[in-house]
């Protein structure tokens, strides 16, 4: 396939340019549907006049439908879109970027989706879909315990989970941490419940505050029910989690002014599992949390991290300096460009 693409680039470059343009239109309609022509033109940076001709072509081919509510992708259009993904990623340089990024971060694998989730929110949905596929490939055992962390990215991951995900496997989804006091929709408990309900699988809850004072923390750790819940979480053979911006996460957790001053003074840029990392990957602060600890990751065979957007690049880089080598990172062009080039330039 790559040889054919190289030949086409030399002999028929215009054909490939048209194919890329129509793929981008189809992709944008799929993630924003139903979407109007004016909105789509703005998303793509294309004039309505030029877009009108392309949309009419896609409709004539049966790839999209046009209604008063907006444009949507047909079943045939979705098949074409999925079939084109690999080719388009190769043409855009994404495959090469993925390999370079994995080498830079010294982890098992990187997968980069087109776009920047800071600018285009539906890019996060695409990252979620890719993460679901990676989890599906990882769960080769008959019985699996999957730990899922909280956060808005993980909530999107849950939304992209297909109803037939179990495929005959016995799956138990467990929250990687407690979450009382956090936004309900983004709590790990809630996300596990949504995934289990959607896929017809099982889940457990960990109804304890995400963070407590040291005395209360040590007291609760002695409770048999808490210990049993933590043992179950620690037995996970796969985990899916995000990476947070340090200050954003601290404020979201209603952290004291004293601690915020500390992590600011010590230049924390990233956060995961209650650990705050500086740009060198050093832990500059840790909060006592109920659930998986960073050191527990060494025992988990399959680790999938989902984080994207230009604004997350420093957080991703800081965390990956300590991440296990078997980590798979699902990110977007926005973060990948900053990590590889230190700029927003397009990946090449």
Indicate residue ranges for each PLM-predicted region.
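Ligand-binding beta-strand-loop-alpha-helix segment within the catalytic cores
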Residues: 99-109, 168-245
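Gly/Ser/Thr-rich loops at beta-strand to alpha-helix junctions
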Residues: 47-48, 146-157, 180-181, 244-247, ...
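Gly/Ser/Thr-rich active-site loops/lids in small-molecule metabolic enzymes
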Residues: 253-282
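ATP/nucleoside-binding phosphotransfer catalytic cores, i.e., glycine-rich phosphate-binding loops
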Residues: 9-17, 32, 52, 76-77, ...
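Short Gly/Thr/Asp-enriched flexible loops that form oxyanion-binding sites at enzyme active sites
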Residues: 153-165, 251-259
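Basic, Lys/Arg-rich alpha-helical nucleic-acid-recognition elements, primarily the DNA-binding modules
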Residues: 1-87
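HTH-adjacent hinge/linker in prokaryotic transcriptional regulators
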Residues: 60-142, 159, 165-166, 184
């Amino acid at each position: 396939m790559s040889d054919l693409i190289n030949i086409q680039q030399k002999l028929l470059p215009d054909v490939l340019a048209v194919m890329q343009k129509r793929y981008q239109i189809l992709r944008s309609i799929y993630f924003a549907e139903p979407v109007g022509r004016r909105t789509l033109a703005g998303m793509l940076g294309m004039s309505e006049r030029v877009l009108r001709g392309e949309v009419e072509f896609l409709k004539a081919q049966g790839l999209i439908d046009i209604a008063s509510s907006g444009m949507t992708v047909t079943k045939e259009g979705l098949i074409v879109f999925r079939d084109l993904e690999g080719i388009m990623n190769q043409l855009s340089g994404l495959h090469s970027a993925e390999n370079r990024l994995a080498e830079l971060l010294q982890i098992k694998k990187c997968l980069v989706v087109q776009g920047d989730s800071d600018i285009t929110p539906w890019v996060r949905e695409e990252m979620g879909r890719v993460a679901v596929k990676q989890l599906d490939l990882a769960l080769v055992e008959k019985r699996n315990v999957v730990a899922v962390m909280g956060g808005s990215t993980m909530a999107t991951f849950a939304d992209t989970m297909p109803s037939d995900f179990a495929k005959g496997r016995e799956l138990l989804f467990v929250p990687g941490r407690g979450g009382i006091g956090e936004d309900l929709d983004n709590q790990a408990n809630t996300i596990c419940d949504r995934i289990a309900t959607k896929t017809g699988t099982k889940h457990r809850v960990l109804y304890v505050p995400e963070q407590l004072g040291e005395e209360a923390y040590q007291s609760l750790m002695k409770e048999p029910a808490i210990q049993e819940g933590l043992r179950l979480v620690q037995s996970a053979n796969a985990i899916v989690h995000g990476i947070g911006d340090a200050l954003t996460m601290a404020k979201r957790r209603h952290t004291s002014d004293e601690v915020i001053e500390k992590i600011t003074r010590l230049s924390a840029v990233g956060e995961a599992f209650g650990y705050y990392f500086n740009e060198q990957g050093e832990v500059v602060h840790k909060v006592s949390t109920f659930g998986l600890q960073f050191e527990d990751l060494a025992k988990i065979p399959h680790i999938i991290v989902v984080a994207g957007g230009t604004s997350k690049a420093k957080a991703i880089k800081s965390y990956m300096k300590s991440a296990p080598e078997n980590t798979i990172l699902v990110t977007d062009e926005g973060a990948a460009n900053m990590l590889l080039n230190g700029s927003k330039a397009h990946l090449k």
